[in-house]
Amino acid sequence: MTFIMTSLQTPAVPEHSLDRDCTTLSRHVLQQLQSFSPEAQDLSAIMNRIALAGKLVARRLSRAGLMADVLGFTGETNVQGESVKKMDVYANDVFISVFKQSGLVCRLASEEMDKPYYIPENCPIGRYTLLYDPIDGSSNVDINLNVGSIFAIRQQKEDDLDGEGNDLLKDGREQIAAGYIVYGPSTMLVYSIGHGVHSFLLDPSLGEFILAQENIQIPDHGPVYSTNEGNFWQWDDAIRDYTRYVHRHEGYTARYSGALVGDIHRILMQGGVFLYPGTVKKPEGKLRLLYESAPLAFLVEQAGGKASNGLKPILDVVPDKLHARSPLVIGSKEDVSLVESFIQDHQHRNHG
């Protein structure tokens, strides 16, 4: 009789592979903070709730063409003056529902709501505010292209006595965490709590976000420039000159999906620059500072990139109202600096 001996010391699956497969989002947050303090557990629980919202939204999107009341518009207009899509309403309600009974946050602020949503029974417990864009790129939903959700967490430091959220009118360096969820061929959550940028893939068989990549670093330079060139003649001369520059020089490629999260994710992984400048009619631009630009700037800076309004870092810009907008130039350091140089050169020439 022949016995086949196997070593108990050699696992059939590499240990590092198992470690990664076993690293869920909530576990990773606690590892990042190297603590089981109440604050660390709160942040871990908040990220878990955001992940739950992402799973619910992803499930809805995956069946969007098969269900009633998912595609198209509601017929209403939001605080931004934009037509509201049904998926915007659903995703906004999902975030409220998953946090309403959590005891983790005392209010949520969304670009879909005029004022913050308050959870009075949680205020003595919840020490945080969640700011979010429930569905970014919602015009893509009806044609089955990628969309996303953007989020940021801020600590409650002051009383909000008038219920207007004026204590949130501070620069982006007040954020303690930020990230996004991209709903594409797979659902991916990317986040930072100030200790690097990390990505997690939703494993449908487990129903869990599993670690995909740690400590993502954006290249210092990349080939992609991402902007809506349909606005070319509405831009000022500096941005038009930059666009002509990339047209004339080899090595650049244009990519624009209509979903901010999708374009930023590409640049995070491959390098390059995303621009949403102001226009002649709207010099403040289109993107909301608190719900879109500042959270993504926090993330990109953590990955070694740069984010600017063309003149100063986005994270240093202080909003004057809850739904303030700002131009955005974000991505690889060298590419953002190049755009800034065109803007600054024009300023010097014009002010002589």
Curated annotation (Swiss-Prot):
Q: Which HAMAP family match?
A: FBPase_class1 (MF_01855)
Extract the SUPFAM superfamilies matched here: Carbohydrate phosphatase (SSF56655)
Does the record's keyword annotation contain Protein biosynthesis? no
The free-text cofactor remark is: Binds 2 magnesium ions per subunit.
Tree of life domain: Bacteria
UniProt cross-references to CDD domains, sorted A to Z: FBPase
Reactions that this protein is recorded to catalyse: beta-D-fructose 1,6-bisphosphate + H2O = beta-D-fructose 6-phosphate + phosphate
Native organism: Crocosphaera subtropica (strain ATCC 51142 / BH68)
GO terms of biological process kind = fructose 1,6-bisphosphate metabolic process; fructose 6-phosphate metabolic process; fructose metabolic process; gluconeogenesis; reductive pentose-phosphate cycle; sucrose biosynthetic process
Residue ranges of coiled coil: none
Residues annotated as transmembrane: none
The enzyme's main class, written as a single word, is hydrolase
A single GO molecular-function term is: magnesium ion binding
Please state the pathway this protein functions in, per its UniProt record.
Carbohydrate biosynthesis; Calvin cycle
Locate the residues binding Mg(2+) 1.
E111, D133, I135
Give the UniProt keywords, A-Z. Calvin cycle, Carbohydrate metabolism, Cytoplasm, Hydrolase, Magnesium, Metal-binding
The entry's substrate-binding residues are: D136, G137, S138, S139, N228, Y256, K286
- Its protein name is Fructose-1,6-bisphosphatase class 1
The UniProt entry's GO CC annotations, sorted and at most eight, read: cytosol
Gene name of the encoded protein: fbp
Q: Which cofactor does it need?
A: Mg(2+)
Localization recorded for this chain is:
Cytoplasm
Q: What InterPro entries does this protein map onto?
A: FBPase_C_dom, FBPase_class-1, FBPase_N, FBPtase, Fructose_bisphosphatase_AS
Q: Where does Mg(2+) 2 bind?
A: D133, D136, E292
